């Protein structure tokens, strides 16, 4: 009907982890004629980075991209010190997933992958892991501790020189992070224009999460930017985010209401020659 010439349809952690993931892909193909592709964690991470690159600051030399999904969380740490500031966004756009897997310096673009990880916990899977813990604050504490254990060997540790790096930026793309920004802004209805690109410090994120814990499930259910259906899931996402910020505190967490979908679009445009 719309004469689509180029498309890419992907499935992520849910299909990777499901025992019948391949059967689901075959059923979609049979019933809709659409070809779904179960992408690897490295490709999911690459697309999340490309999709959020628009929020990269010109002065940023070290960037950590955080993508909190439903079934997994991707973290990608890039060193951009070998790239001219004006070329940094375009250089990231040219990243390939095999570069992530090798964790190396790309001689063509100058982008260095310091580290990357795909943690098999997202907002849904982490919540399910502790579904038997009824007390709100206890469940949050256990989820936070569990996730922090997973990332203990990722990237530069607290003992490294990160504290003295002035040009460090975290870009966060997920419903958790956009929701925290929206409630901090006091929005009565979610507004992408106000949230996308909004910046918070680690301390501000911590205070907002504390407000979620103090208010409890009932308060979260009544908040227009959270709601009853997400009152529990927001806490598993908050536990993930706070664990990351506890290890790598920052004054610049940039909220990205963009990610995987935009990454697919941009990468396809590069592939087809529409972006150079």
Where are these regions (language model features)?
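Helical "lid/coupling" subdomains associated with nucleotide-phosphate turnover
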Residues: 1-4, 13-62, 77, 85-276
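Active-site loops of AMP-binding adenylate-forming
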Residues: 81
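Catalytic cores of RNA-modifying enzymes
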Residues: 66-68
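Acidic, divalent-metal-coordinating active-site segment for phosphoryl/phosphodiester hydrolysis
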Residues: 70-78
